[in-house]
Amino acid sequence: PRYFSSAASDVYKRQIETVPSEFTLHARKEKHNVNMGGDNVAFAMMASAPNCSDIDNGRRAGNQKDFQNFLRLAQTHNILHMTGGYPVEPVDIHASVRHLDCIHDYITFTDKAYCIYSLGEERVADAIEMTRIAHGLSRDQMRDQACMFSIINTNSPLQLDIPMMQGVMALSEMGQPVVITPFTLAGAMAPVTIAGAVTLQNAEALAGIAFTQMVRPGAPVMYGGFTSNVDMKTGSPAFGTPEYMQAQHVGGQLARRYLSLIHI
């Protein structure tokens, strides 16, 4: 209520009513399809680690070979229902074309569903087209079959930047799910208290979710959240803290309050 007028709140409520309670994320092999929503729980790899390590070669910056090896592991382990985002960032590929190589590797090394990065209209269009071809679908068929997803981070406080909004519009129009995930760090871009930071997270998530339904009513979307705190001496993000876990518990309850789809 602090962030939205009652009229705006009514708009958001009407839009959120069209969010599907469940959907299927289709892999290229039917046995790897993932049911999202309801009482289903799905596990994926973590995303965007800058470095990786192993016993033989130690710690190093991410590269395409390591990226491919992580995809092989994701394909092998049945506890991973989908690959998620880039398990390690392949910094040896230029950023301007990295998405093309990474999606090609997704398609080559695994038949599970994957996450694409919403970094502007052109890159999202590339991802949609490559995924459509890999699944053997027409554009009309793809609009009714979720094949990939994307994490959409807000630019807290209370805004979404242009590349993310372009991704939301392109993916929602094509019926591909997005996870609206506010990145709200208490003491930095969000109030310093957990209650205040989670309130901001909730406002931003609901606004993003409502926007997907303005683009296309019934588009699959999930409530995400990354609320943590910062080191008050250095300003650096702090991960795995008690405050982070408190925010996750509260965020999950809020997501179930508003929607039956949740991603944390």
Predicted regions span which residues?
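Single conserved hydrophobic/aromatic residue that forms the stacking wall/gate
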Residues: 1-8, 12, 262-263
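Short, conserved glycine- and acidic-residue-centered signature motifs
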Residues: 4, 63, 199
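Residue-level detector of solvent-exposed, low-hydrophobicity positions
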Residues: 4-8, 50, 251
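Catalytic alpha/beta active-site cores
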Residues: 9-191, 195
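Glycine-rich anion/phosphate-binding loop at the beta-strand->alpha-helix junction
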Residues: 151-262
